[in-house]
Amino acid sequence: MPVNFFATIFQTLLRNKEKELIRWPAEEGSSKNYTGHELLEKIGAIRMALLNQHITPSQPVLLAVPVSIDLICALLAIQAIGAVPVLPPAKAGAGGLLKVIRDRKIRFVVIARSPNLLRRTAAWMKNFKFIMIHGLPEVHQEILVTDVPPAQPALVSHSSGSTGAAKAVYRSHAVLLAQHQVLKETFPPWPDQVDFPLFPNILLHNLAAGTTSVLPDIPRFELSKVDPAVIAGQLIREGIHTLTGNVYYFKKLLAYFEQHALYFLCVQAIGIGGSPVPELLALSLKKIFPRATIFIIYGSSEAEPIAVRMVGDEPVHPLAGYKVGTVSKHIQLALAPAGEVVVAGKRYPVGEITIKGPHVAISTGTEALGTGDFGYLDEHNELCLTARKGNELICKGLQHYQLEQALMQDQRVERAAAIVRKDGFHLYVQGNIGEQEISNILKKWIDISVIKSISKRNRIPVDQRHLSKILYNKVR
């Protein structure tokens, strides 16, 4: 049966024409607010610009637009006509964009403003055309949504590249609809909820649910430029109820909020994801947001969420790995056997986590998605992560996430990477802590002979998107 993910958002916008659905940061602490009606107008204008170029259903269209309201509306307009929006990899330069254009056989590239001579020359040489969308005139014409096959891609994005080069991720209309339903079921929205999403997929989910989204005021949406003082002002001024983010983001906020003795009573729930979440971070956030329930959300570009854990007051065992909680009832999860790990004297079968289900994007010709994460199910049937593919060797009942989580219990440790080789583990630690102190932490939990070296590093390399996932193949 033909579908279109945008149809869900379209109907929500029609029902909420007067409601502010997006508050986008503007200059000097202000925001530009967009009602359902205003969003429909912008989407309609871009839709007409696309149709004027005779773009057809299933045709890929590259979005070379900075993170902005224009980007969101262009993405939705492309979906509306049944075409396929393609997002480039994080921080892709000109060469990266041209590679996407070549690999995906793209003929149309959406940009905000008029291209310079160099861009026009590249377009002529590579046989593609620019479509400018900023400041388009209003179009007084009803938006018609084009139905497409459920398996047609609704969005092409790229992974973070934590296990190598960023790979294209194809999410179909059926998968996006299923992800929206699972998120809605897992975290039911409530009337007048004000959310503060860092992740773009949550913004799309909010639009489909009719939840107001306030976007974090981050320059050019480059996470490394986040100013915790500005975010604090937004949380207070906008009356934020819920917020999501990754480890880098919440670490930056936490350090500033603790330093200035700030706490926020309006926030009712926090979701942390995007990479393994240190237990100490999750517990520390409970002090800053005393009325909030803290959730650890485990997912991937292909499936969101896979598992969710509500963080209690007591930390998990330091060698448990990263505990991510209860697997979604809509997910069929299996562990490709790799051996056993030991936690507090108990042995658990461990393996690569493979999943399938209605909200999982699976490549054609494969039966299940290999997540690249290794883990086990504990006695409460909760999922714990123990390793990342490429660094998954088991040594004396241990995998690298177990050691890293144990070290991250100490607030002096900013990052830790345990590289496993045949002889044992080689530790690389970033933070204000000495090698002997690192050794003393681990002696409490393991036979220290498994540690073959400890090295301090000023910076441990991480991915470009989340700034949180360690690039183990680049740790030296």
Which residue ranges define each predicted feature?
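Conserved pre-ATP/AMP-binding loop-to-beta segment of ANL
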Residues: K17-E20, H140-H158, G164-A165, P188-Q193
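Conserved AMP-binding/adenylate-forming core of the ANL superfamily
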Residues: I22-I55, Q59, A64-S68, L76, ...
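Conserved AMP-binding A3 loop
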Residues: N33-H37, A154-Q181, T212
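Adenylate-forming
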Residues: I111-T121, D217-R220, E238-S284, F295-A303, ...
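Conserved AMP-binding/adenylation subdomain of ANL enzymes
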Residues: L177-V194, F199-H241
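AMP-binding/adenylate-forming catalytic core of the ANL superfamily
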Residues: I236, L243, F250, G351, ...
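Conserved AMP-binding/adenylate-forming
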Residues: L283-I297, S301-E382, K389-N391
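Conserved C-terminal "lid"/linker of ANL adenylate-forming enzymes
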Residues: A417-A418, I441-R476
